[in-house]
Amino acid sequence: MNSFSPTEDTIAAIATAVSPGQGSIAAIRISGSSAIETSKNIVDVPGIQDWSTHKVLYGHVTEENRKKYIDEVLILVMKGPRSFTGEDVVEIHCHGGIIPVQKILERILAFPSVRRAEPGEFSQRAVLNGRLSLTQAESISELVSARSRKAAELAINGIEGNIQTTIQSIRKRLIEQLTEIEARIDFEEDLPLLDEKHVKNEIVAIKKDLNELIDNAKRGSWVRSGLKVALAGKPNVGKSSLMNRLSKQEKAIVTDLPGTTRDILESEIVLEGIPVTFIDTAGLRDTKDIIEKIGISRTKKTLIHADLIILIFDYSSGWTNEDESILKQLPVNIPLLIVGNKSDLMNDQSFEKVPKYILKKENLVILSAKTGNGEDDLINYLLKKCGSSQTHGLDIALNERQLDLAKSTTESLENINKVFDEKLPWDFWTIDLRQAINYLGELTGEDLTENLLDNIFSKFCIGK
């Protein structure tokens, strides 16, 4: 880790989610040299209670005149370096709700020595003070925002240091190869010949390990961000019924009137650890209704950003020119699944009303949103699309920042292979090798500037 100037000011922020009328407990976190003294100045603690480290005290936060209580609280005292940030930390736990927690924070921030914390600043101080690695801090943020158990599991693995250990091991192997090469450049006459074949083989092996991490990151992205599935089709083909069936909730209004859905509705389920968000869109058709037109416009924007589009048609009535027109309007770069709904209403003529080129499609599922018949086929398709079976055994998954740096590292290693092939001098070998080492150092936080750290932690939530 680079050496940055120590933090001198004291910071404070609400450390828990706060909503009106929700949550029985809230916490305010204070970190810095004046954290304990500030807390003593706003809290009345009855009896003889010890403010020594790792103690819990009971008391009341008072108004500035010390005559009125703001709230009844518990005070957790953690003196540095044995705290989350490595500094003196005090957490004040009060009753939940907006008013008490805001009044206590305002009371704390009234002291000149304390300022409001920036997003992620507590975690940033923990990294700067050596309490956490950068990847551990990022994993804490991932845990807070986890939308499934698998995502939380991956985040915990990162907090335990799995990402840091893995990347550091790869970086160490690269440093060993760089050391061998540079030693031959500086002291060629005093050392045995460089085993060029061994160096090349080791670079290939390292690149293979990195590519596995990159593949894992792609699989992990489904676990983290989930799959966005847009339900498209003409009005009254059962889009809303299908979403209600899949989500097990009455999210959308279901009627026999075409054009009932005029806005974008969403519902989320978790399939084997992967969040899947279904987006029920307004039916695509020509209409003079102004409100419905707005809904259709939003539908087209939603389709562009979906991971998968499910085009639904009425299987009992057959494939129509309107269905064909909608198919041609869909983005060609988004994966498509065609679903024939209302199979419970089909008759002998239904099959003949669907073109053979539609029936032959591998991405075709026939079902009934009303009865649930065929629902398993749709779920299995989604699981296959997510690659959920591949998430079993997935221990670590890089986030977007880490993934970009891992890709840059492999590009540098690929450049080294070109240098090998062109039989260039050893000096050329070291250029990309050193760059690859720097990329991995940036990934783990061992080779970072303060500006880069500020940028990374600005994406964290306040209070973390």
From Swiss-Prot:
Gene Ontology BP annotations: tRNA methylation; tRNA wobble uridine modification
Residues reported to bind K(+): 236, 255, 257, 260
Keywords: Cytoplasm, GTP-binding, Hydrolase, Magnesium, Metal-binding, Nucleotide-binding, Potassium, tRNA processing
Species lineage: Bacteria, Bacillati, Cyanobacteriota, Cyanophyceae, Synechococcales
Cofactor: K(+)
Main localization, broad class: cytoplasm
EC number: 3.6.-.-
Positions of the TrmE-type G domain: 226-387
Species of provenance: Prochlorococcus marinus (strain NATL1A)
Chain's role: Exhibits a very high intrinsic GTPase hydrolysis rate. Involved in the addition of a carboxymethylaminomethyl (cmnm) group at the wobble position (U34) of certain tRNAs, forming tRNA-cmnm(5)s(2)U34.
Gene Ontology CC: one annotated term: cytosol
NCBIfam families to which the protein is assigned, alphabetical: mnmE_trmE_thdF, PRK05291.1-3, small_GTP
GTP-binding is among the record's keywords: yes
Annotated InterPro entries: G_TrmE (IPR031168), GTP-bd (IPR006073), GTP-bd_TrmE_N (IPR018948), GTPase_MnmE (IPR004520), MnmE_dom2 (IPR027368), MnmE_helical (IPR025867), P-loop_NTPase (IPR027417), Small_GTP-bd (IPR005225)
Cofactor binding comment, as recorded: Binds 1 potassium ion per subunit.
Name listed for the protein in its UniProt record: tRNA modification GTPase MnmE
Family to which this protein belongs: Belongs to the TRAFAC class TrmE-Era-EngA-EngB-Septin-like GTPase superfamily. TrmE GTPase family.
GO MF: GTP binding; GTPase activity; metal ion binding
Record's subunit section: Homodimer. Heterotetramer of two MnmE and two MnmG subunits.
Gene: mnmE
